[in-house]
Amino acid sequence: MFKANVLLMGGDMTSKVMVPIVREPEIGYTATFLGKQVKISEEGLPDLRKQIRQHCYLPYVCSKAEVEKLSRDQEYVEKVFEDLEVEMVKDWLSLIPKKAPGVKVIIHPGNDDKFVLDDVLKNSPDIVFAEESVVHFDDLHEAACVGWSNPTPWNSPRECTEEQLLEKLEKTVSQLKSVETSCFCFHVPPYNSTIDMAPKLDATLRPVYEGGRPAFIPVGSKSVRKVIEKYQPLLGLHGHIHESPGLVKIGKTQCINPGSEYSEGILRAYIIELEDGKAKRLQRLEG
């Protein structure tokens, strides 16, 4: 449709929600999905799994005993999540030759993506794994890719101090041939940039309301902003804060965050056309 030469995915590939589908000897299967109790037969299982995945949730077919173990064994929960995430990413990667033939697919993880996924991505012949490295869009335009974030309330796998993040950013940017014609593909957006606004949380991680409305605060990275202001790349390509889509200029650099509504089955992205060291087109896409 768009005749793209490159497809870039900048992290947060996997779901944070698992949906147990419980085997019931006399019923078939039961599950709680989208707030509703669902009962299905064996024949309906593939369709339910498909529906769950379309919302980017992780379907987990299991017994009642396994559900009970999930409720009391956090290590088991983590192991199941890892296995399901690996399975989902492998399934997605298998679609690339059919869905995007001839397209250069570049993927780097985000702060929420577990390290176990790195080997899955590195072993795929159909993508370029780009974490903490530089990749080429074409002969002129490069991308410096870093998926780590500054600290979050969620203790995610790839977060670090601002000082550590700055070191990672500088090390990666130093590999670029020409910053002026390059993109900074940093998962976390720059601090206080309007594309980093997230709900303010209290000590129990519940949203704070002010004047009867949820309060929002900037949660992006000061190190990312510092590096963008220092080097002024062509584009800043960001994500991380799903509820804060937009486009903003920091100096000469246009920074974008497409946002995300994956749980609603909505794709958000940007169509970017690069030519002669300039961004000729930045078109938001959702559907």
Question: What is each PLM-predicted segment?
Answer:
Residues 1-138:
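Core catalytic region of metal-dependent phosphoesterases/phosphodiesterases
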Residues 7, 12, 110, 143, ...:
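Divalent metal-coordination and catalytic microenvironments
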Residues 14-18, 103, 107-118, 135, ...:
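Active-site environment of divalent metal-dependent phosphoester hydrolases
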Residues 70-86, 183-232:
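Active-site-proximal segments of metal-dependent phosphoesterases and phosphodiesterases across multiple
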Residues 104-106, 128, 142, 181-183, ...:
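Proline-centered loop/turn at the N-terminus of a beta-strand
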Residues 134-140, 156, 160-161, 227-230, ...:
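Binuclear metal-dependent phosphoesterase catalytic core
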Residues 139-183, 202, 214-222:
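Binuclear metal-dependent hydrolase catalytic cores centered on His/Asp/Glu-rich metal-binding motifs
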